[in-house]
Structure formats: structure tokens, C-alpha cells
């Protein structure tokens, strides 16, 4: 059984009810988590780790924003109203993170998408990001992220510019 996109206190209540009633345990949490949206690190990820619940993040590539240089637009980015609500509030700091992601991609010989996914996979409790691909070659590219191990200093370089974001994605 899995849960998705809720506040940590809500999930803690659900976990408690599950235990009280002897119901099947929660084994996964689908949450909004990526290099430019890390609010889940404050409460949800520690709760999941403590409870042994695997995290399967949605939007691991920030709706494509982590796959290309920051100012580069696509038809999807221009027309994606959900993406604008999720990410446009924090453009300046996110641009710094994306720039550093690009440097790490060059340094490792990997793509930006592979580095972003490798970062996620380096986090305790993250089992597998929920990826989306519209072409077979995209899927093949993304799957290679499991073989990429980032150095601690590379992770720190990408994480340092992060600033707190408004919580989005659920009510």
C-alpha cells in the first residue's frame, strides 16, 4: 500500500491508524522531490526513513527543467501551467542549482537528467524516482543514472544554493 502527496503529520496519522488496526503496512510514499524542490527533506523523508517506507519521488526532473540549461524553453515549459505553479516562484535560486547541475554533468560525462536522478538515488530511503519518457532513447538514457555515483562534494555543490520553497503539490 502506498500514499502520495500529503503533509508528514497526515501520513504519521495514517501510519498510526494502520498499526492500531493491524492493517497492511504502507510501503511507499510518492512525493514531490527533486533538486529544486526539497521541502520533503524537512519532515516527510525522515518519517519515511524511520518507518521503513520507501520514497518514490514524482517530478524528479522538475517537469523537464533539470534536463537543459535554465533559460532554454520548450513548448512544454511555455504551456505547462502546472509546472509554472510548481517552479516559477523560485527561479533565481533554481537557476543556480541548474547551472551547477550542468557543470557536474560535464564533469562526469553524464547528461543533466542522469545527474539529477543520481542525486535523488543518493538520498536515504529513495527507492526509485517516477520517471516519464516519451521515447525509448529517453528511457534508456534515464536508466543509466543507476550506474552514476556522485561524489559528496558534487552533491554539496548542487545543494548549496537551495532556498526554502513554498510547499506545493497538495492541500
Regions flagged by a language model, labelled:
Residues 2-160:
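Beta/alpha (TIM)-barrel catalytic core signal, keyed to glycine-rich beta->alpha loops juxtaposed to Asp/Glu
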Amino acid at each position: 500500500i502506498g500514499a502520495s502527496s500529503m503533509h508528514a503529520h497526515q501520513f504519521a496519522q495514517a501510519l498510526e491508524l494502520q498499526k492500531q488496526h493491524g492493517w497492511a503496512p504502507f510501503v511507499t510514499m510518492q512525493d514531490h522531490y527533486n533538486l529544486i524542490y526539497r521541502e520533503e527533506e524537512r519532515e516527510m523523508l525522515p518519517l519515511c526513513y524511520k518507518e521503513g517506507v520507501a520514497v518514490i519521488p514524482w517530478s524528479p526532473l522538475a517537469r523537464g527543467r533539470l534536463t537543459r540549461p535554465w533559460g532554454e524553453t520548450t513548448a512544454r515549459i511555455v504551456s505547462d501551467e502546472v509546472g509554472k505553479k510548481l517552479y516559477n516562484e523560485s527561479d533565481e535560486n533554481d537557476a543556480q542549482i541548474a547551472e551547477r547541475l550542468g557543470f557536474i554533468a560535464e564533469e562526469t560525462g553524464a547528461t543533466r537528467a542522469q545527474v539529477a536522478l543520481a542525486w535523488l538515488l543518493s538520498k536515504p530511503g529513495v527507492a526509485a524516482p517516477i520517471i516519464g519518457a516519451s521515447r525509448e532513447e529517453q528511457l534508456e538514457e534515464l536508466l543509466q543514472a543507476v550506474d552514476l555515483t556522485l561524489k559528496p562534494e558534487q552533491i554539496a555543490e548542487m545543494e548549496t544554493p537551495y532556498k526554502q520553497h513554498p510547499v506545493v503539490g497538495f492541500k
